[in-house]
Amino acid sequence: MSDTTTTDESQDEPPADTPEAILRAHLDDHDYQIFEALNEDGRMSDTELSDRVGLSRTAVRRRRENLIESGILDILAVIVLQEADLAYADVRVSVDQSVGRAERDAIIERLVDAELIYSVNSCLGDHDLFVRTWHTTLNDVKAYVWDLLDDPAVDDYKITPVVKTWKAWNRDLDRPTSD
């Protein structure tokens, strides 16, 4: 007869392929609960957090401050571009492979410094950079990207307009509806 009993530890493990399971290497249960609560409401007070997490206000404040100071947690406000009826796009950029590190770094610096770029990522595959940008209209997005990437060190780029976002920043923004 096989032993099918489970220990309490295995019952406490979150399901694989969940944020909680993946973040266990960085956050204990209380820190994860703090993250979840602040992700729902970034303005939640330490008193509300302590009630929700089951720790003292001082302990919650110390943990929140440690998470922020370590760079693991950042509390910020974002504009939900589709709700503001603004245009946004993903841009995949290929850098000329013959250019040196200084030229590549200059492109990245320019993208990071650009106010209408909200994400700059290095990637593997057909392109070197994955960039997200926004503007008033798609025509403005296109002109902005043209100007920004007018550089001999940029080999190629592709602009993909985004027309709908259902989920961002670990939040449902909308759900598909069947008409």
Named regions from a protein language model:
Residues 1-179:
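A compositional/biophysical signature of low hydrophobicity enriched in polar/charged and small residues
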